[in-house]
C-alpha cells in the first residue's frame, strides 16, 4: 500500500485488512459453488438429457439444471472480479453478459419452480385431466415460454451495464443516463488527501486510498454496486491548475456517476454541472483553510465547508435520489421474480398437502413432491437475502451506519443467491429413497427415482398387481 505523509492515515491504511470476513466468505462460497455446481449440474444434464427417457418431470428439472449450469459458468468471472476488488478486465461485452446470466438464472429458475408447483397441484387435484393433457410437448412449450420471459427480464441489465475507465482500472457498473447530472448513488467513496502547505501553480496531484466502505466490490448482478463501492488501491487523482489549493489534511468524499473523469476539480464533486463549477472560485483564499470545519459524514467528513452550502447543497439534495430505472428494475425483480412466484407456490403446496391428507397416494408421488418442496425451499432461502438487501439499498442512506452495513453485505447476498445453483443435484440424490440404497445405485437410477412419473408409475403398479392376481388365480386352479 502507498503510505501517506500523515502518520495516522498511514497507520490506519496499513492496519486495514485487504478483505473483510464477509468478503472471504463470499469468495469461498463462490469457489465451492462453481466447482460443485459445474460437476453436479453437468452430470445431471448428461444423464437426464441423454441417458434417461424423456418425461414431463425430466423436462422440468432438465431446464432447471440448465439454468443453474449457465449461472455456474459465470461464477469464475464473478470470483475474479471480487478478488481484484472491483477491477473488470474482461471488456464491455462480458460486463454486460455476466450480470445478465445471473439474472437470467434467477428468473428462469423461479418461473420453472412455479411451473413445477402448478404441475404438482394439477396432478393431485386433476389426475384424469393430467392423463389426457399432460405431455412432454406441452412441457417443452412451457419451458420455452419461461426462457423467453426470463430473457426479457434480464434485458435491462444487458442494456444499462457499461464499462468505465478510472485510472487504468475498468469498472463495470450501471449507466442509466450519462448525459444528465450524476447520481448520488452511483459512486460513494472517500479519498484521503496528504498534507500539503504549498500551492502548485501547474497541477496538484492528490494521491490517496479509496475507503473500503463496503469492502471489495459486489460480484454481481446487484443493481448499484458492481462498481466502486470497492477498495481501489492507491489511485492518483489530478486537479486542474486553476483549481489547485493548499490544505493540511482533509477527507474528500465525492459522489459522482456517469463517466468518471480523469481530472477532478478540487472540493467540487464532478457530478455537478460545469457552469456551476466555473461560477465559483475554488482556492484556499476563497473558503478553505487548514482548520475549516467540514460537513460531518460516516467517516471523518466532507471537503465542503459550511459556508459553501448555499451554492451547492440544494443541487446536491436534488441529486440525492435513486434513478428511476434502477427503482423499476429492483421492484420488478422483487415482485415478479420473488413475491408473486412465492405466493403461487405456497398456495399450490398448501392445496397439495390438504389433498394428500385426505387421499392415499403412491410412494412415487410423495417422493417427487418432497423433491419439489425441497428445491423450492432452498431457492427461497438462497434468494431472500438478495432481494432484502436490494430493497434496503434503495431506502437507506449510504452515509448512515445501516447503509454502510447493508452495502458491506451486498456481495455476500449475491454469493448466497449464486450458491443455489449447486444445491439441486444433491437434493435430487438425497431425497426420495433411503440414502444407503441410493449410494449403491447408479447415477441414472438415482435421477430416475427422483424424477419418476407418478401417473405412469401408478398405472404400471396397477397393471403389475392385476397381472400378479391373474397369475395367482391360474396357479390356484
UniProtKB/Swiss-Prot annotation:
Tissue localization of expression is:
Detected in varying levels in all tissues examined except the spleen. Especially abundant in heart and lung.
**Sulfotyrosine modifications at:** 174, 184, 312
One GO molecular function term? Answer: complement component C3a receptor activity
- Species for this entry: Mus musculus (Mouse)
Q: Summarize the subunit comment.
A: Interacts with VGF-derived peptide TLQP-21.
Q: What does this protein do?
A: Receptor for the chemotactic and inflammatory peptide anaphylatoxin C3a. This receptor stimulates chemotaxis, granule enzyme release and superoxide anion production.
Classification of source organism = Eukaryota, Metazoa, Chordata, Craniata, Vertebrata
Q: What Gene3D superfamilies is this protein classified in?
A: Rhodopsin 7-helix transmembrane proteins
Q: Which UniProt keywords apply?
A: Cell membrane, Chemotaxis, Disulfide bond, G-protein coupled receptor, Glycoprotein, Membrane, Phosphoprotein, Receptor, Sulfation, Transducer, Transmembrane, Transmembrane helix
Protein name as annotated: C3a anaphylatoxin chemotactic receptor
Q: Which family does it belong to?
A: Belongs to the G-protein coupled receptor 1 family.
Keyword match Cell membrane: yes
Got a GO cellular component term for this one?
A: plasma membrane
| Membrane-related topology note | Multi-pass membrane protein
Where is the protein localized? Cell membrane
Q: Which residues are listed as membrane-spanning? A: 24-46, 58-80, 97-118, 140-160, 334-353, 371-393, 411-431
UniProt GO BP: calcium-mediated signaling; chemotaxis; positive regulation of angiogenesis; positive regulation of macrophage chemotaxis; positive regulation of neutrophil chemotaxis; positive regulation of vascular endothelial growth factor production
The record's annotation in PANTHER family points to:
C3A ANAPHYLATOXIN CHEMOTACTIC RECEPTOR (PTHR24225:SF28), CHEMOTACTIC RECEPTOR (PTHR24225)
Q: Which residues carry this modification: Phosphothreonine?
A: 456
Q: Which residues lie on this side of the membrane: Cytoplasmic?
A: 47-57, 119-139, 354-370, 432-477
Q: Phosphoserine (modified residue): where?
A: 452
Q: Which InterPro entries match?
A: Anaphtx_C3AR1, Anphylx_rcpt_C3a/C5a1-2, Formyl_rcpt-rel, GPCR_Rhodpsn, GPCR_Rhodpsn_7TM
